Amino acid sequence: FFSAPLIVAMLSAIFLKDILSLKGLLLMVMSFGSIIYSLGPSMKVLSPELIFPLVPPLCWALYQFFTKLISGNNDPFASIFYTAITGAIVFSIYVSLNWTPIEKNSYWLLLVLLGISGFISHFMLIYAIQLSNLSFVTNFQYSQLVWSTIINFMIFGVPIDVNKIYGVIGIIVFGILFIKTEGSKKKVKIKN
């Protein structure tokens, strides 16, 4: 998913004519490089199958791109309503063919909480995309590594290695520089 902001930046520059400076694009690439460094991939695993991990970020980038393209001046509630209805119809077909009863009633509460958090996060994403340039908003997705590192350490006890520390520092530094570079009101079109 970490390549999605780069894909979105390219799509929005070509089709939406979003303004993104060369310095901003370089900072996005450097943030992406920080992610790659922190994950520490091995060069021994290069194979044609590596194209498959590009499909999810491409789908996520297309979701954000089409959300920006379609939502326009619509109410974010309308956008999330149509997204939810489409998802409910598509996945109801799948679930009806593969239904397994839920074992514990407490799982229903977790499903409801998951739905509420998904609604809130998608509503905020749609609202942010409507207010600003798409390439500006999507760069904040790089903070996922910071939060996942903290959660993995605090909740699951996964140790933090040196690569992750350097990667998190890089993401934070390049993110702050990106906000300073691309966050001026002249470049980011904020609606009043």
Which residue stretches match the model-derived regions?
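Helix-helix packing/entry segments at the starts of transmembrane helices
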Residues: 1-3, 70-86, 122-154
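C-terminal transmembrane-helix exit sites in multi-pass transporters
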Residues: 4-26, 146-165
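Hydrophobic transmembrane alpha-helices of multi-pass small-molecule transport proteins
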Residues: 23-40, 163-182
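Small-residue-rich packing faces within the transmembrane alpha-helices of Major Facilitator Superfamily
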Residues: 32, 88-89, 146-147, 172
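Hydrophobic alpha-helical transmembrane segments of multi-pass membrane transport proteins
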Residues: 37, 54-66, 94-136, 173, ...
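Transmembrane alpha-helical segments that form core, pore/gating elements
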Residues: 42-99, 190-192
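Loop-to-transmembrane alpha-helix initiation sites
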Residues: 49-50, 106-107, 159-168
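Membrane-interface capping segments at transmembrane-helix boundaries
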Residues: 131, 179-191
